[in-house]
Amino acid sequence: MDIQIIDETKIVPEAQIKLVEDVLEFAGQKLELAEDTEMSVTFVTNERIRQINQEYRNTDRATDVISFAIEEDPEEEGLPANFEELFDIPKNIGDLFVSLEKAAEQAETYGHSFERELGYTMVHGFLHLNGYDHIHTEDEVKMIPLQETILDEFGLKR
């Protein structure tokens, strides 16, 4: 996968960036995404993610991850359904905005390592970019076990 990492905080250690890239690459393989699939991860402060949450979700609080999936339907644009394949264009699945501050707070609250929480945050957002959700029970029973399987197989067990 082609993962663009943007660190607006300017303080994310290289080891954490590597963990993010590795866990997302692993998750992409589990979902059998094309190797040229694109996405971005932007690290922001609690204040910035609170602003994004307020602007796009009308919720005035910081959160760990906000996902913006690109849900393009080529057929709606008058293009063939396999447009990306026909023209060898990588599929961009979207963008994640992540607060490491919030992830650290949650790791402490839940009593597990920061690395586990960071992996959880990444996989959770990644699954949202790929159409998974947990609002309704019938969706949750698909997303949550898959999320746990990816984390466990990657080595980030509870």
UniProtKB/Swiss-Prot annotation:
HAMAP family: Endoribonucl_YbeY. It comes from Latilactobacillus sakei subsp. sakei (strain 23K). It is found in: Cytoplasm. Single strand-specific metallo-endoribonuclease involved in late-stage 70S ribosome quality control and in maturation of the 3' terminus of the 16S rRNA. One of its GO terms (cellular component) is cytoplasm. It is an enzyme of class 3 (hydrolase). SUPFAM superfamilies: Metalloproteases ('zincins'), catalytic domain. NCBIfam families: rRNA maturation RNase YbeY (TIGR00043). The gene is ybeY. This is Endoribonuclease YbeY. Belongs to the endoribonuclease YbeY family. The lineage of its organism: Bacteria, Bacillati, Bacillota, Bacilli, Lactobacillales.
